[in-house]
Structure formats: C-alpha cells, structure tokens
Amino acid sequence: MAKQLLGKEVTAALNERIKADVAKLNEKGIKPTLGIIRVGERPDDLSYERGATKRCETLGVEYKKYLLPANVSQEELLKVIDEVNNDDAIHGVLMFRPLPKHIDQKVVENALAAEKDVDCQTEASLGAVFTGQKVGFPPCTPQACMEILDFYGIDCTGKKAVVIGRSLVVGKPAAMMLIQKNATVTVCHTRTVDMPSVTREADIVIVAAGRAGVVGAEYVSEGQTVIDVGINMNEEGKLCGDCDYAAVEPIVDAITPVPGGVGSVTTSVLVGHVVEAAMRKYA
C-alpha cells in the first residue's frame, strides 16, 4: 500500500509559516491584502473565491473584491487593473480566468503589475520561473507540488522526474521547478510515443494531463512518488484525479489522493504569495 501524501498536513505546516510572517507584518502596521478581480459568475470561479477568502480569513490576510459583469468592456477592466496596481494597500491580485471572449486576455493579464501577480498571470512572472529571478510569483499549483515534495522529504537531486502535461499553468513550470531541484526531467504530452515506457522509468511523476483516470497501472512502477494534479468529475459525480487511483496506488511508493492532495495546498500557496509580496515591498 502506498503512502498517502496528504495535503492537509502540508497545508498545516505552510499555514503556520504564513501566520508567523503575517504577525511580523502586523507589528509594522502592515495588513497584507489580496485584491480579487472576477468577471461574471462562473461556478468554478465562485468556488475558488470562497476557498481563497476563507483561507485569507484563517491566516489573517485581508481581501478586497472587484466584481464586474460578464459584459464588462476591456477598457473598464483595464481601469480596474490600473486601480489595483496603484493601490499601495493591495499587495497581491488574483484575477479569475478565462476571461470572456470579447476581452483580449493576454493584454489584460500583462497589464497587471508583476510584483502583485501572485498566480503567475503575467509573462514577466512566467519568465521568472525559467530564469529563477524573484519577479512576480510562480503558478500556485506547481508550487503546491513542490511544497508536498519538500514536506515529505522527497529529495529530487539526481532523480528522474516525468511531468505529464505541457501547459503553461502546470506542466512547463513544474518541469522547470523540478530542474531547479536538480532533477533530470522529461515532459510527456499528447504526441509522446509510448508514454507508459517513459513514465515507468521515473522516480517522480507529476500528472497534469487534464483527463480523468488516464494514468493507469501500465504507467507506473514500484518505488515511485506520484503527484496527481488532476481535478475531474467522474461518471458518478465524484471528484477524481488524472490517475486511476485504484490501479496505481497498490504499485507505487507514495501518491497524492484526489481530493485531499494538491488542491488543498494550492490555496495556502496563493495566500502565502500575498504575504510574501507584502514582505518584499517593505523589506
């Protein structure tokens, strides 16, 4: 039976670090604050917003919402971004995506000040993931994966790591972050030939395929650590990951469950970025 890499244990440790940093800021009269920009009322956005605001409240971080109708003009949205960019009381900004089709998402994303970009929405932040510079922040989900590896003492140095998925949101940043941990990294994707033969050779597998249960027993081998980023609904309406958990779990050494794995860490990473942004500003 594989060891379960439980997100709640990682989150508890991360939250204690964040609370300590918030206390230091409060001593200086600084209240770390997240600006939340939401266009429309997509159910996924509303759900994540509830989780983010609840975590902010738990950790002593304030938030301010900027709620806009789905038919808002690009000009009006850019005005809001300019407002939060110039508001010294706002330290980090979360803008929900995707934006409505009538808005040029790239233009709007890159209008955000990089130092307030707590979920890697700007090209400046994304570039910093590859250069290692402290400009903006990495995407919250791949950083949550790294937090899990660190918490459970899984050393990446010299290890073979495979990332399934090449998106700019998870796959590519996760690969770069593993390289920074001195792993030897292979990225698999929809055009990879005989993917199971590649993934079986890995010590660490991060699965961000975006399809429920796509990674089965043939993809894994004994001794592996598997981080499942996927969040999907199965035919029974239950949350499940990109791994076929029942098939994979008996084989590997350690695995994150879904739910209860990566997703539960991501929100604390986001709030931690807000606090770090405030600390950078007033360092």
Features from the language model and the residues they span:
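Anion-binding alpha/beta catalytic cores of soluble intermediary-metabolism enzymes, centered on
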Residues: 92-156
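Short, well-ordered coil/turn residues at beta-beta hairpins
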Residues: 96, 208-209, 229
